[in-house]
Amino acid sequence: MSWRTKLTWKVEWDDRARKELRKLDSPIQKEILSYLRVRIAGSKDPRVFGQSLSGNKAGLWRYRIGNYRLICRIEDHIFVVFVVGVGHRKEVYET
């Protein structure tokens, strides 16, 4: 017998990332949240839309939303994309 259930990805936020999101303008916040809801949470593999990072951020993934970036950790075993950073592309990699 073969069966398949549709598993969706859950997006969770680090407290610092949530604070960074609140500092952004409202239209940018909405665009980021919409991107996460439509592209990431609804996908079979969230890696398709992102790019893996290297160096001191190895193991993390980044997602481009205009001039803004989401830095995330993907937890395959529990189907969670954990947002650890969000900000303008010139600043988000500094921390």
What residues fall within each predicted segment?
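Enriched for short, Lys/Arg-rich terminal
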Residues: 1-15, 19-22, 27-30, 34, ...
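A short, surface-exposed loop/turn module that caps and links secondary-structure elements
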Residues: 38-62
